[in-house]
Amino acid sequence: MSTSPVAIVTGAARGLGLAMVERLLAEGYRVMAADLASAEASWNYELGDINAMSAALEANGEDRLKTCPVDVTNADSCAECVDATLKHFGQLNLLVNNAGVVDSGPIDTFSEAAWDRIFAVNTKGIFLMTQAAVQALEGQENASIVNTASIAGKKGVRHMAAYCGSKFAAIGVTQSLAQELAPRGIRVNAICPGIVGTAMWLEHLMPKAKSTSNEIPDFADYVSQLIPMGEPQTAEDMADAVVYLARTNNVTGIALTVAGGMEMN
């Protein structure tokens, strides 16, 4: 049986999650890539589809990578994802709680349904996946949880009360779990991306965009005014941060900002 470490990555079908999966595979991990079963779930931009990702992976013959559907807002679904991982790989060393959604708008008209959905995915999802995985992580070598937060979890942004609130909460949950789980040998950290040209953000902020920031010349000009280092972050930058936090031995409870100097708190 392989002794290489095993990771679960949620929100894995595209964007940051897909880059994390690819980087973890390159680092020798075996990976369970988890996301919604269909991109047709109702939201203000196209969501990931793990079934489509699974078909592509099977065509490539990658045997260190498996996929499973997960709805991180549903406790049973989270438990089934962890169970599937243990059944296939036999262990779990790293949980990457990356699933997330975004929406924005003035408080006068922002819908209660959107508010609830954002908190359910971005914050409750961390709780449910961690609850499902914690016993499997305990006792494993260098067991670790990495949560995707945001620089919007460190500083409020106009018209983004729900998203910012959910990411502030994600950092608070990270710090609390780091305290609680340290005696059980599990480290818990967060990454805080800056402006990343993923489809989630481009399709929300720039509805005509459908894939990457490279297709939107104005995007680079826009972010260069906001970021001291002059260019947007990439999904690969976030994957680098996940690998660092997964591999280090004595770091827990931090919210690691990867934002080119845009946020220095």
Write out the residue ranges for each language-model feature.
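Active-site helix of classical SDR
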Residues: 130, 166, 174
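Short, small/polar-rich loop/turn modules that mediate ligand/substrate recognition or access, typified
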Residues: 182, 187, 250-253
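Residue(s) in the substrate-gating loop at a strand-loop-helix junction
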Residues: 150
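Short-chain dehydrogenase/reductase
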Residues: 2-89, 103, 207
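Alpha-helical segment proximal to the catalytic Tyr-Lys
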Residues: 135, 179-183
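C-terminal substrate-recognition "lid" of short-chain dehydrogenase/reductases
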Residues: 231-258, 263
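Substrate-binding pocket helix/loop in short-chain dehydrogenase/reductase
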Residues: 106-107, 114-119, 223
